Regions:
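HotDog/MaoC-like acyl-thioester-processing domains
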Residues: 3, 69, 100-104, 111-157
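Short aromatic-glycine motifs in intrinsically disordered, low-complexity regions
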Residues: 8-18
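Short coil-to-beta-strand transition motifs
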Residues: 16-23, 101-106
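Catalytic strand-loop segment that frames the active site of acyl-thioester-processing enzymes
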Residues: 19-55
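Small-residue-enriched segments and motifs
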Residues: 22-25, 88, 108-110, 138
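A residue-level detector for short acidic-glycine micro-motifs
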Residues: 26-29, 92, 97, 112-114, ...
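Compact, glycine-rich, soluble single-domain proteins
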Residues: 51-70, 84-88
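Hydrophobic beta-strand-centered segment that forms part of the acyl-chain substrate-binding groove
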Residues: 69-107
């Protein structure tokens, strides 16, 4: 599969999160083997702790949105709309700092590891854009249903 020609579409066209929960600044690179996105942590105001810091666990949301951007770009290559996915969990998550820096650009990367029956696993990293220092890493699993209407939603409206 070929890489999508730049410039890439804005993240808002690729991921379902909108408004203040749309946390990716832009797509940096993409091909079938993975996607890298830029993140401006200062824009993550809704996820800050009471003291104004940005907890390291927010890296998981950046990673999940990068996975969504990867899927959105692959769908776009096929002429299809982005599909909704659900974060299932993480393995081997490692946070090398207690809080994320607020005043410098970060780079998040998601690389697909395996897929089957709608369950996909990605190797993800979060680094400082300036020097490549790794801040967080882990494997994230997402579920992408074939048909949202077929999901048992219980008492949800």
């Amino acid at each position: 599969m070929h890489a999508v020609a730049e410039p890439f579409p804005p993240p808002a066209e690729l991921v379902p999160q909108g408004g203040a929960m749309s946390l990716l600044s832009r797509v940096i690179s993409h091909d079938a083997h993975g996607t890298s996105c830029a993140v401006d942590p200062a824009a993550s105001a809704l996820l800050r702790a009471a003291d104004g810091s940005l907890p390291a666990w927010v890296a998981l949301e950046y990673m999940a949105q990068c996975i969504a951007a990867h899927g959105g770009l692959l769908a776009r290559e096929r002429g299809a709309p982005p599909r909704i996915g659900f974060f299932v969990g993480s393995r081997r998550a490692s946070f090398r700092v207690p809080t994320l820096p607020l005043r410098e650009e970060l780079r998040v990367r998601a690389e697909p590891l395996r897929a089957g029956s709608g369950l996909l696993t990605f190797a993800c990293t979060l680094e400082r854009a300036s020097d490549g220092e790794r801040l967080a890493e882990g494997q994230l699993s997402v579920f992408i249903p074939d048909d949202l209407a077929s999901l048992p939603l219980g008492g949800l409206p």
